[in-house]
Amino acid sequence: MKKSFLLFLFGVAFSLTSFAQQTIIRGSVLDGTTGEPIPDVTITIEETNQTTTTDAKGEFSFISNVPLGEQVLKVEKIGYVTKRYPIVVNEGSTVDISGMTLDYDPGDKKDLFTISISDDNLNSEDDGLTDNVSGLLQASRDIFLSAAAFDFSSTFFRPRGLDNANGKVLINGIEMNKQFNGRPQWANWGGLNDVQRNQEFTMGISANDYNFGDLAGTNNIVMRASKYRKGGRISYASANRSYQGRVMASYNSGLLKGGWSYSFLGSRRFGAEGFIDGTLYDSNSFFAAVEKQINDKHNLNFTGIYAQNRRGRSTAITNEVFELKGREYNPFWGLQNGDIRNSRVREIEEPILMLNHYWDISPKVRLNSNVAYQFGEISNTRIDNGGTRLVTFNGESSFLGGARNTNADYYQDLPSFFLQDPNPSALDFQQAFAAQQEFINDGQFDWNLLYEGNATVAAQGGNSIYALQADVIDDSQISFNTILDADLADNIRLNASLNYRNLNSQNYARIEDLLGGTGYLDVDFFAEEIGQDVTDLLETVAQSDIRNPNRIAREGDRYKYNYEIDAEVVSGFAQAQFKYNKVDFFVGANVSQTNYQRTGLFENGNFTGTGPQGSFGESEKLDFTNYGIKGGLTYKISGRHLINANGSYFTKAPTIRNSFSNARQNNFTVTGLESEKVQSADVSYIFRSPIIKARLTGFYTGFEDGTDIGFYFTEDLAGLGIDNGDAFVQEILTNIERRNIGIELGFEAQVTPTIKLKAAASFGQYTFTNNPNLYLTSDDFEGELRFGDGTTNIKDLHVAGGPERAYQVGFEYRDPDFWNVGVTSNFFSNAYIDASNLSRSANFTSDFDGNTFNDFDPATARELLQQEQFDDYLLVNVVGGKSWKVDDYFIGFFATINNVFDQQYTTGGFEQSRLGNFRRIREDQSRDNGPLFGSRYFFGNGTTYYLNVYVRF
């Protein structure tokens, strides 16, 4: 008994002695102006791989594997000037460096980039064409990603060839990516720059605390009231990119007595037009967060976001139009009563409400549970020129009406249309010259024509032939998740989460404006009888809803199409992180279940019936089970030299957009639909010293079983007969395989305390690696239309999506008197046009009967189908700022000038698929005065500026 007791006392004494001899570094970080603690500050022991962050009280500690001797602590946080603190660590002692301060950084570029990603890129046709630097807001600490975010993004550049659908954006741990297309809708929190500064970014597929992640990284925007520094900010911005002016005001309380904290923000952005003509901007944004610290273990936070955004849109144009009108031309706007009015207006209004509970179960175990509700609509307007009226004569019904295409750049209004013959006549030249002068002097949308046309028809007792239509997505989504973060040991950490999302999406067309008319007959004027059955009679086929035939739609009514999509996603994730003296590594896995179902609320006349083969009622229920595994390793050669490697394999459910072949008209699902398979790997060499930082990365990503759907009007489809080759089609591609490989480099050198040199480079190749399956569907023919072996020959073509190669050199100067200036030169090359899939199918070689053209020439065909590579270009950008401290106020400005030398360049484009066979394309491309249906291009902005003036207190 005595022996046991003595052993017990010895054990206690040994433990106490060991504890007393433990080497510890601890401290705290305060705001240099307010003296308030700063949470989420990154503390790094330089030339080691040891990093930690401050807690809500601004405190931190290193308690294991602490290096001895002279060390340097690097203290950094976005929005503050980075500082370095030298310390001396003795074995068995505690170094207490409490009260370190960080000063506000008036030259931080975060505000600028939030503008870029949230505002400039909302004009994309597919919600992802230009907002291609997903999750890089926090990534400015990485040299290469900083260049990609601030200087490369205006060119459609995509790091590693990945768009926003390959990255995850979270707010307070809740995923914000849309289930419709997999992309984050940045406009949902646009204009809230001041409350987006607290972000946690994880690059690529590496370990993160919240979910499995994705190839382009994971960005968690922390919008907790307690995480904002105490104080307020008022600012005004002037620009000529997307909006012309922005006013913003915000205030954060900091932690108050009783454990309360709150944060509020309001902003307005406005402009008659941006750099592109006629692109109006009208947006109001509001934010509120309130948090209660219930006790030392529990915090409850509420966040509300309302960001309404209304914007005029623009489009790609042909070279002919560009030569006549320039890169600022936009065919969508015209004057109405002396005011600019855009026919294509996009409006987004989807508020977000969320409640977050934070539970510190113990010092080593934390549980975060969240619930969010998002609702509202996205609408896109366009002109409907298919208005008609029903006429019955001798017992037969027909529809009279319809109108000419109203597009301002319609091909029949351009000079090339009148000069299409090989030997134009004098009259042809006269008409071409008249068209040229009319287009140069005006060339804008004619609103008066629409009102006059409707007035004329109304006087004759007819319905409107023109109307302003809005395509509406009205979503309601609820999200739940719970996130576990546990320290299993000093060097082992467990992350896990469970997630659930439920979406009800109503999709319909709505009459926004009858343009002076009295009503709109809800039928398809362009419908055709495609069968011999009595049910295919035109009066039936043309109906948008045969359960309510020949309905007259008024303003605010749903018409044309009306359906719901229900979607549900359940997922689980687990990850373990291990840290040792020489090696850190992690492993992670996830599993998910996704299901979609369409419910038709209109029974379309072209696709009568209920169930999966009709248009009314419920479609087949699509179910996808997916999984993923990932791992990574960091080998610390020394404190300055590191090797990092990551690898993953995972599957992804197709998006809603790519699951239904024509959701607006029927319940048909994509034939051969599968989850996409993704494999990726990257290896990096990292060098870090007090003067030089560098990262060199090689990466590989492979994609299999991808799916994509496109919509367009085309002519001369093979095999349908001489009179039946024209159709508006849905083009479905399945079994798409792609490969992205390349190298990234980031380098910076702090050559003096005030001057920093920097360089970045990306050398990539992003190509298709097989010939995917292709088929067409349409209401102009029955079934699925395939050509030849059913594939399109795009193997080895480049995936369109900005330049594959980008290079930067630049410098920054930061003066001790609180002003700074920076200049970068950025070179871009190897950008390619988006190739037509139809032109590379067997349809290209076949006539209307499906036979091969007798004059087909392979050499000419290769020349016609050569994928266009855009010209290289160089852009120079300048950035600078200055701040003053007046009593307790900071007053300052921040300015940028992009494309200083007004370089003209092409950022993207696509081949039109209107002409899809060898003879028609050869004929069109060989015209002396230019093609009628040439490729369309997006052109980059000229010289633009952004100026922000602010007061912070």
Write out the residue ranges for each language-model feature:
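Gram-negative outer-membrane beta-barrel transporters
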Residues: 579, 700-702, 726-837, 950-952
